[in-house]
């Protein structure tokens, strides 16, 4: 079962410049693990040293924040879309998520 | 503290209808009108703030003609137009997002427009900040913005705050306004604006952009989540701005800032369904709008049930910005552009490495430089010989400092960072080279 993971602009450089990736997964945790095993550079931008999702990165299943669902245990099926939504500062000077 | 107002700027009137109204209304300018309960999709009722109206306030015949396309719509009409005239909106930033915000709010007849910015117009702004003209380059943005607004609608009172917004002045500046529209470009100010709005109970109309992507929402802690409910913390220290990853399509802030102007006007009118509790995502490349649900976080440090942030804090420190710029782990030896030119003139052997991106290399380059984009340095460092003298450069010197640091850790010793990058080269050595 492949779920679509939407990659935001600032992170596309670490995901082969793709705007979305299809991953076989039953939960959000599996999908993100699959994504970061495919694109190793993404890992440190999504997770901290303890392997927890960084607090400036939110993950949504369709339009719901997984923090208010079952977090990484949130089940997904192939019609679902997972979105990674990092905070962006915006404007002229960009403080971006870069290595 | 806000600077003293320039006597050349329009002074704020002492007897604005809004202030008179505020004095008469102990509840303040925002009163909850039970008639304006708006149903948010499956989320129950949201109480819309609405300005109380001053019965003595009227439009002149000129204003009636000017706003006639508003007045003939029942959703605005005379009542709404008078609300707009009484409204006081504070725009944080007179740049990419601040441009459409200020232009459309002024044109729509928002009576008082505060603007906070301390920047000066430069040529790189003109690609998107259409409130400023070519002739304005070198002028303070607020002076330039004020002139444009005055040309569009002389009825608008512009109150400039040519200052760096900080924890000491934010509450004092914000307190006189009904709505704050956040068009800033950095995390410390985002969190400062959010916290000040939560503490004062004011709506924060949020917009943010990155390259081809935008976000917009209305953070109004009385009725829904705040920015910290969405993002409790900013990215950690060490994540510095990089020109390679920056850039923004000129039209994008026009779209996102216009959405902010629209939401601001809806809040003033008390009409429609505001972006409270919703995050709008806009992808310009694929022309897609998406919407995510935002929920109030009961554990939010500023608007939750047990807040730990009860006054403004040091936001530079909170965001790990302070002191970050010049604290590399190892000392990075530097060399000036003039010294590099001298080495070239004296035909001293050295290798010049350019760590910018290929599309930057096409804009301008120093003759003889070898292009190895920063991201490729680890896998291509075998192309360099640690026995050679090496000078590394980028656009401004930030990325090349990282490359030098990395190469030194890998055993390179005869290596220098070109201080100020190609910008310094263009300034001090080759004035015919374009800057970007």
Where are these regions (language model features)?
Chain B
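N-terminal charged helix/coil linker that caps or initiates catalytic domains
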Residues: 46-90, 312-314, 318-328
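E1/E1-like adenylate-forming module used to activate ubiquitin-like modifiers
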Residues: 47-52, 153-259, 269-271, 286-288, ...
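Rhodanese-like catalytic fold shared by cysteine-dependent sulfurtransferases
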Residues: 49-51, 147, 284-298, 302-350, ...
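Glycine-rich adenosine-cofactor-binding loop
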Residues: 80-106, 112-117
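A short, aliphatic-rich alpha-helical micro-motif
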Residues: 84, 173-178, 384-385
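Residue-level detector of alpha-helix initiation sites
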Residues: 96-99, 110, 120-121, 184-188, ...
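Glycine-rich phosphate-binding loop and adjoining beta1-alpha1-beta2 segment
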Residues: 116-153
């Amino acid at each position: 079962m492949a779920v679509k993971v939407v990659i935001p602009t600032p992170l596309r450089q670490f995901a082969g410049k793709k705007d979305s990736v299809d991953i076989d997964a039953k939960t959000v945790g599996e999908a993100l693990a699959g994504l970061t095993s495919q694109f190793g550079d993404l890992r440190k931008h999504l997770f901290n040293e303890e392997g927890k999702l960084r607090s400036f990165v939110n993950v949504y299943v369709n339009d719901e924040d997984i923090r208010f669902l079952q977090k990484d245990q949130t089940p997904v099926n192939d019609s679902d879309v997972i979105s990674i939504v990092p905070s962006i500062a915006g404007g002229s000077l960009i403080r971006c998520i870069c290595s | 503290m806000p600077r003293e107002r320039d006597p050349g700027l329009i002074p704020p009137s002492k007897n604005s209808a809004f202030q008179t109204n505020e004095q008469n209304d102990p509840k303040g300018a925002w009163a909850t009108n039970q008639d304006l309960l708006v149903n948010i999709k499956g989320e129950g009722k949201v109480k819309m703030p609405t300005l109380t109206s001053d019965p003595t306030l009227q439009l002149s015949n000129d204003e009636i003609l000017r706003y006639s396309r508003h007045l003939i719509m029942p959703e605005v009409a005379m009542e709404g137009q008078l609300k707009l005239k009484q409204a006081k909106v504070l725009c944080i930033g007179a740049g990419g997002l601040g441009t459409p915000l200020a232009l459309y709010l002024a044109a729509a007849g928002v009576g008082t427009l505060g603007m906070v910015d301390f920047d000066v117009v430069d040529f790189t702004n003109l690609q998107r900040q259409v409130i400023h003209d070519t002739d304005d380059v070198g002028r303070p943005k607020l002076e330039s913005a004020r002139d444009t607004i005055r040309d569009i609608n002389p009825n608008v009172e512009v109150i400039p705050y040519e200052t760096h917004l900080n924890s000491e002045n934010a509450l004092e500046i914000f307190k006189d306004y009904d709505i704050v529209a956040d068009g800033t470009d950095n995390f410390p100010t985002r969190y400062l604006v959010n916290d000040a709005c939560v503490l004062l109970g004011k709506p924060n109309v949020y917009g943010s952009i990155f390259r081809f992507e935008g976000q917009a929402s209305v953070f109004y802690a009385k009725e829904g989540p705040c920015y910290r409910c969405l993002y409790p913390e900013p990215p950690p220290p060490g994540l510095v701005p990089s020109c390679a990853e920056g850039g923004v399509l000129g039209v994008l802030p026009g779209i996102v800032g216009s959405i902010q102007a629209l939401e601001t006007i809806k809040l003033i009118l008390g009409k429609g369904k505001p972006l409270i509790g919703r995050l709008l995502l806009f992808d310009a490349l694929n022309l897609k709008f998406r919407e995510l649900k935002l929920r109030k976080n009961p554990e939010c440090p500023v608007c939750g049930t047990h807040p730990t942030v009860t006054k403004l804090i040091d936001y530079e420190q909170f965001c790990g910005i302070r002191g970050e710029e010049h604290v590399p782990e190892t000392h990075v030896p530097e060399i000036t552009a003039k010294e590099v030119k001298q080495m070239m003139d004296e035909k001293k052997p050295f290798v010049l490495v350019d760590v910018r991106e290929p599309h930057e290399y096409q804009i301008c380059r120093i003759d003889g430089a070898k292009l190895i984009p920063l991201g490729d340095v680890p896998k291509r460092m075998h192309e360099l010989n640690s026995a050679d003298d090496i000078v590394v450069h980028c656009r401004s010197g930030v990325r090349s400092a990282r490359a030098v640091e990395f190469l030194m850790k890998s055993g390179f010793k005869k290596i220098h960072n070109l201080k100020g990058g190609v910008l310094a080269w263009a300034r001090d050595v080759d004035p015919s080279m374009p800057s970007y």
